[in-house]
Amino acid sequence: MLSALRTAGAVGTRRLASTQAIASNSEAPKGIATTGTPFLNPSSKAEYALARLDDVLNLAQRGSIWPLTFGLACCAVEMMHFAAPRYDMDRYGVVFRASPRQADLIFVAGTVTNKMAPALRRIYDQMPEAKWVISMGSCANGGGYYHYAYSVLRGCDRVIPVDIYVPGCPPTAEALLYGVLQLQKKIKRKREAQLWYRR
């Protein structure tokens, strides 16, 4: 009886191990480690160490995103909902800042006019490096309802580079939360130390 239980347990363990191996192999493409590092087949210990360094730096940046509020129109109300206690963005490390010198993310929320474009560019230039931009709403993405107005910029990506576009008029706070989570995934895939090593 005892030997039959041991045999059944061993078979169950083997099945579990084989299904876990299949799951891990099917999730990651060939040659990419399961940790998500983009270094393919590191050939030296230095490359491996730099890949782990990138993982640690990306984890720190991903866990402490400090956005700058740049509300220009009605999308700013949804950005305020996003910052309110209902969504509790502090658990993701999102802490709003009022100064561009302390922020590493800017939410462009609303219609960007031609007069506001130089101010937006100046604020973007004042942010320290490793900076990201989330364009929020139809007006910031491409002009929206005011696309054909003479005084409206047809998308903030004509002035500053945009990382994530959040569609909607206005987008909900949940959509903005999804955009922040997508930005965190993008930060996770960064590989600055590895690219520096390859130069």
From Swiss-Prot:
* One Pfam match: Oxidored_q6
Q: Between which residues do disulfide bridges form?
A: none
Task: Give the cofactor note.
Answer: Binds 1 [4Fe-4S] cluster.
State the GO CC annotations: mitochondrion; respiratory chain complex I
Task: Name the InterPro entries on file.
Answer: NADH_UbQ_OxRdtase-like_20kDa, NADH_UQ_OxRdtase_20Kd_su
Q: What is its EC number?
A: 7.1.1.2
Q: Which reaction does it catalyse?
A: a ubiquinone + NADH + 5 H(+)(in) = a ubiquinol + NAD(+) + 4 H(+)(out)
Q: Which GO terms describe its molecular function?
A: 4 iron, 4 sulfur cluster binding; metal ion binding; NADH dehydrogenase (ubiquinone) activity; quinone binding
| Positions contributing to [4Fe-4S] cluster binding | 74-75, 139, 169
Record's subcellular location:
Mitochondrion
UniProt keyword terms in alphabetical order: 4Fe-4S, Electron transport, Iron, Iron-sulfur, Metal-binding, Mitochondrion, NAD, Oxidoreductase, Respiratory chain, Transit peptide, Translocase, Transport, Ubiquinone
Q: Which PROSITE patterns match?
A: COMPLEX1_20K
Cofactor(s) required for function per UniProt: [4Fe-4S] cluster
Q: Name one GO biological process term.
A: aerobic respiration
Q: Identify the domain of life.
A: Eukaryota
Family of the protein in this entry: Belongs to the complex I 20 kDa subunit family.
Subunit architecture: Complex I is composed of 45 different subunits This is a component of the iron-sulfur (IP) fragment of the enzyme.
Q: Write down the HAMAP family for this protein, in alphabetical order.
A: NDH1_NuoB
Please describe what this protein does: Core subunit of the mitochondrial membrane respiratory chain NADH dehydrogenase (Complex I) that is believed to belong to the minimal assembly required for catalysis. Complex I functions in the transfer of electrons from NADH to the respiratory chain. The immediate electron acceptor for the enzyme is believed to be ubiquinone.
UniProt protein name: Probable NADH dehydrogenase [ubiquinone] iron-sulfur protein 7, mitochondrial
Species of provenance? Caenorhabditis elegans
